[in-house]
Design a protein with these regions (language model features):
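Blade/loop signatures of beta-propeller domains
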Residues: 23-55
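Beta-strand-rich domains and repeat architectures in extracellular enzymes and scaffolds
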Residues: 51-85
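Blade-loop segments of beta-propeller domains
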Residues: 57-62, 95-122, 129, 151
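Structural signature of eukaryotic scaffold interfaces centered on beta-propeller domains
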Residues: 68-71, 116-120, 158-164, 223-240, ...
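Asp-box/WD-like beta-propeller blade repeats and closely related beta-sheet repeat scaffolds
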Residues: 130-193, 208-216
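Loop-centered beta-sheet repeat module
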Residues: 195-257
Length: 317
């Protein structure tokens, strides 16, 4: 039996709050009704995932860092030090493996690594910086090539390794264009979500997806009237079948697979444009027989960081 539940992650298990049989639209597509109350269901993390605890060994001063994990592969954990700009590689046992720092202004360097992806098979380290440029190095810092991005695009955080030959990303520059159009009272049509799949070797565009969206701003409007783009939206999530595309402006999650039609997976109701305070869908993760989603709320000019975030879960088998 399929079901939808709200869930709150806590320690190593989930509290599912509210659970009712899954509602289906007339076309059979599953949806979440955020106005409804669902019963509670508890799920332990160990029931849906293999849990491993790793302590990254920083006894060597060269591997001390202040930052976050950027990439996890079959055998490696990649961390970026936010102070020095160094990129550090640890084994899955937490032991230091290699490191490099190519921070600088030169043609073979990065200003600061905003996003790092690691392809362990080819030993390619993709480093995105503020210039919207992607440099490619080995895990020891040997320079390989620059990967041209489609003109005018800016992947930043919304980028994943799609397969052995390609990267998949959302052009976050569209959010800046929307703010500029609003500020200049422009009538430019910028209400769409652009996604690209590009070659890891030369940056060639292999596929382009353009999702239409509701013309509504999801970020914050300050007291001075300035628009601030929304933070924390996870628009691309890897899945076993391809990638899940979360498009909150249209309340829908799509499944993208290579050489196959785009498939809607689930949507939220009521629509983002009709809710007050505004609620929008964020993130969608497949894990085992379950699918997890978040719903954020914007009350007035404040983002829902200060408001309870609702977590939903459904059994989709």
């Amino acid at each position: 039996m399929k079901s939808i539940v709200e869930w709150f992650p806590m320690m190593i298990f989930f509290f599912a709050i509210s659970c009712l049989p899954e509602k289906q639209a007339k076309n059979g597509l599953a949806y979440i009704d955020v106005t409804k109350k669902y019963p509670e269901k508890e799920i332990f993390l160990t029931d849906i995932a293999e849990v491993t605890y790793v302590c990254l060994n920083s006894d060597d001063d060269d591997y001390l860092y202040k930052g976050r994990i950027h990439s996890i592969t079959e055998n490696m954990i990649v961390v970026c030090d936010e102070v020095s700009g160094s990129i550090l590689f640890f084994t899955k046992e937490g032991n230091p493996k290699s490191r490099f720092n190519r921070k600088g202004q030169g043609p073979d360097e990065y200003i600061f690594p905003l996003r790092v992806l690691f392809d362990e098979t080819t030993d390619d380290v993709f480093v995105m910086d503020q210039r919207g440029r992607t440099q490619v190095y080995s895990s020891t810092g040997m320079y390989k090539r620059v990967l041209p991005m489609p003109q005018g695009t800016m992947p930043l955080n919304a980028i994943v390794s799609f397969d052995e030959a390609s990267l998949f990303f959302y052009d976050e520059n569209i959010l800046i264009k929307r703010i500029a159009a609003d500020y200049n009272r422009s009538a430019d049509s910028i209400w769409f979500s652009p996604f690209y799949r590009i070659s890891k070797q030369d940056g060639a565009v292999l596929d382009y997806i353009e999702l239409q969206v509701t013309p509504i701003f999801l970020g914050i409007t300050t007291q001075d009237g300035f628009r601030v783009p929304p933070r924390g939206i996870t628009r691309i999530v890897k899945s076993k079948e391809g990638v899940l595309l979360c498009n909150p402006e249209s309340d829908t999650v799509f499944l993208y697979r290579k050489n196959q039609p785009l498939l809607p997976v689930i949507y939220k109701t009521p629509s983002v444009a009709s809710t007050d305070p505004m609620t929008y869908l964020n993130n969608c993760v497949d894990e085992g027989i379950y699918q997890f989603m978040e719903v954020y709320t914007v009350a007035g000019n404040e983002l829902s960081i200060r408001l309870p975030v609702k977590y939903y879960m459904r059994n989709h088998y």
